[in-house]
Each structure stands twice: as structure tokens, then as C-alpha cells.
């Protein structure tokens, strides 16, 4: 069954790879974004709606932490404070 195939012959899909890993020249290393709240010692607050506007999109959605660079702890707190500000009518739920 496998006698026709040479044991030392590699599969054609692995010809351009070295040791199973392909070198990708298009890959760029990105600097990890630091959390604005951890660096400054400031905590998100619903009353500071001008600062909270930086963390929502034009449509009014909360930006994810991979874009804002906040830590998981502060992202959860930020989402809570944005929701409080929306409830208090300091921030809109949806922008037109």
C-alpha cells in the first residue's frame, strides 16, 4: 500500500517549510497597548462622560479591550460605568 512512496520523500505541502514552521515575512510585531487606567491610577467613573466617550464607537457601542488596550479588570469596570452613564442619560444608547 505504501511501498510505492519513498519514506524519505516529503509531502509537497511541506517543501517550502523548515522543520514544520514557515517563515512569514509579512508578520509584524505589535507593541502591547498599556492600560490607561493602570498607568494613571485613574478609575473609570460614570460622571466623567467626556473621558468615557473615548471608549465608545460613533454608533455608541463599547470598544473591545483589544482596541482600547485596557486590562480585563478595567474593561469590566469601564463597561459598567458606560452603562451607568447611559442610564443617567449622560451618554446616548445609540447615536444617529
UniProtKB/Swiss-Prot annotation:
Keywords associated with the record: Ribonucleoprotein, Ribosomal protein, RNA-binding, rRNA-binding
Subunit description: Part of the 30S ribosomal subunit. Forms a tight heterodimer with protein bS6.
Any GO BP annotation: translation
CC annotations in GO: cytosolic small ribosomal subunit
Similarity-based family: Belongs to the bacterial ribosomal protein bS18 family.
Its job: Binds as a heterodimer with protein bS6 to the central domain of the 16S rRNA, where it helps stabilize the platform of the 30S subunit.
Protein's name according to its UniProt entry: Small ribosomal subunit protein bS18
Amino acid at each position: 500500500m505504501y511501498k510505492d512512496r519513498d519514506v524519505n520523500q516529503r509531502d509537497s505541502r511541506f517543501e517550502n517549510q523548515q522543520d514544520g514552521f514557515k517563515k512569514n515575512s509579512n508578520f509584524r510585531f505589535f507593541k502591547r497597548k498599556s492600560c490607561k487606567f493602570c498607568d494613571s491610577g485613574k478609575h473609570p467613573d460614570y460622571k466623567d462622560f467626556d473621558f468615557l466617550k473615548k471608549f465608545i464607537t460613533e454608533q455608541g457601542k463599547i470598544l473591545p479591550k483589544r482596541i482600547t488596550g485596557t486590562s480585563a479588570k478595567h474593561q469590566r469596570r469601564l463597561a459598567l460605568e458606560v452603562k451607568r452613564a447611559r442610564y443617567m442619560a449622560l451618554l446616548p444608547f445609540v447615536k444617529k
